[in-house]
Regions:
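Basic, polyanion-binding surface patches
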Residues: 1-146
Length: 146
């Protein structure tokens, strides 16, 4: 999405473009405050992970480290970068598309062979400063033809 920095893309975008690897760390309601700390617009030579006092662990298939606080880590390789129309002059806007090559899920969040989304309470970014937590889950059968 649009970069909060006025001089170009986010550091994360630049790192992915340069290294072709990244980790998607799923944020939960419990970790929302630490996740928010990583949004601090620091200088390029400063680490948002260090700023937020987050611990990392070695990833299994990619060089970038995974966050220990995240119960799900998706290790990815860059597939494609899609440039989008610029909203404000001088800013960058684009989407990174990755191929997931490995997933780590903490056992506590697996129930009957599936991710227990209700226990996980993942965050969803809605836009602006708005977020949501997934805590109301229901199933619906797909319609069939007769």
């Amino acid at each position: 999405g649009p970069s909060p920095k006025k001089e170009g893309p986010k550091d994360t975008f630049s790192n992915i473009k340069n290294n072709n690897e990244f980790v998607v760390n799923i944020s939960t309601y419990e970790s929302k405050d630490q996740m928010n700390e990583t949004c601090m617009p620091l200088e390029s030579d400063k680490s948002e992970i260090d700023f937020a006092s987050l611990e990392t662990k070695a990833s299994k298939l990619v060089k970038p480290k995974s966050l220990k606080i995240s119960p799900i880590n998706m290790e990815c390789i860059l597939h494609k970068i899609v440039d989008l129309p610029v909203v404000n002059k001088g800013e960058y806007n684009g989407i990174i598309i990755g191929k997931v090559i490995g997933i780590s899920i903490e056992d506590d969040y697996i129930k009957d062979g599936r991710v227990d989304v209700k226990k996980l309470k993942p965050l969803a970014r809605l836009g602006y400063m708005d977020y949501s937590v997934i805590d109301n889950i229901f199933e619906m059968n797909r319609p069939t033809t007769k």
